């Protein structure tokens, strides 16, 4: 997230040090299972105290009230009690974008960052999540004023990001629903598709294009520069690889994802990183419950767009 560390693998399919799946392309060995008895596996969380979250939320609300940010993605680390290993989670997770760096973290993201193919660049900002068991859940989230405002802000930010690197930028699909099956049931997530036309020899400047859009708008906020300063003040810890990006380039096409749905190891303990968008209309208790609701294992059928 801070652009201070990264990996560049020259032969991604020919190595096993870092395992990945990006849009159906993977170097993961087949048939990997779990150790022990499935029924004996446990996964529970030790959430941050609400009072601690309140302090972080207050810093963000103050910045929003000053006009320094219209929307800010506030993230937290939730401690886990689990006997799942990072490797087991990676191999069992059903997600279109997976990444495992042994001993450090596992990521199982449903969110595309950018795709580049045949002169087109596409981004798919994801903003808005609801439990599918909520009565009339799709209508509820699509008609929710706060959710709509957040999504509009992020789509506008992504459109501006693409305008810096592409021409004829357009919102091709706006606020469509993905239904995702996770370990505790189903959730609905709201995304949009923003596209643009790349010009010239864009292959020679892929890195410039990608780095010019970082950090991703959906996990930072708008406007970016002042929002990032507030994030540093409120979160009081580095995100590291969490909310960064990873991807695969086959020589013609680039596919990449935002590193959300992320479990890391620190000092022998597991932490699940999650976050949510804060605006002037946000309620602290509701936002706290949302970041905890995002702590799950994707042992269902997550769909790609």
Residue ranges of model-derived segments:
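Extended alpha-helical targeting/anchoring segments
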Residues: 1-305
């Amino acid at each position: 997230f801070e652009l201070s560390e990264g990996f560049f693998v020259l032969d991604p399919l020919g190595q096993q040090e870092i395992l990945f799946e990006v849009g159906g392309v993977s170097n993961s060995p087949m048939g990997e299972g779990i150790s022990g008895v499935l029924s004996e596996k446990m996964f529970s969380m030790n959430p941050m105290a609400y009072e601690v979250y309140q302090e972080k939320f207050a810093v963000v609300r103050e910045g929003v009230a000053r006009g320094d940010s219209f929307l800010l993605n506030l993230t937290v680390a939730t401690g886990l009690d689990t006997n799942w290993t990072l490797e087991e989670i990676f191999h069992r997770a059903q997600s279109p974008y997976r990444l495992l760096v042994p001993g450090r973290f596992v990521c199982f993201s449903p969110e595309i960052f950018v795709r580049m193919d045949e002169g087109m660049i596409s981004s798919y900002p994801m903003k808005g999540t609801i439990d599918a068991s909520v009565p009339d859940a799709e209508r509820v989230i699509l008609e929710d004023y706060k959710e709509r405002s957040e999504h509009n802000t992020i789509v506008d930010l992504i459109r501006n990001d693409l305008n810096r690197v592409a021409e004829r930028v357009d919102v091709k699909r706006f606020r469509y629903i993905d239904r995702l099956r996770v370990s505790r049931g189903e959730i609905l997530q709201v995304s949009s598709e923003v596209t643009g036309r790349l010009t010239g020899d864009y292959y020679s400047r892929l890195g410039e294009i990608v780095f010019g859009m970082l950090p991703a708008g959906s996990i930072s906020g708008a406007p970016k520069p002042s929002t990032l300063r507030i994030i540093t003040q409120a979160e009081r810890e580095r995100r590291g690889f969490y909310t960064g990006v990873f991807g695969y380039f086959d020589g013609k096409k680039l596919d990449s994802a935002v590193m959300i749905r992320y479990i890391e190891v620190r000092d022998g303990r597991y932490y699940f990183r999650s976050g949510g968008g804060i605006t002037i209309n946000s309620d602290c208790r509701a936002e706290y419950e949302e970041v905890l609701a995002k702590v799950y294992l994707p042992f269902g059928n997550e769909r790609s767009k």
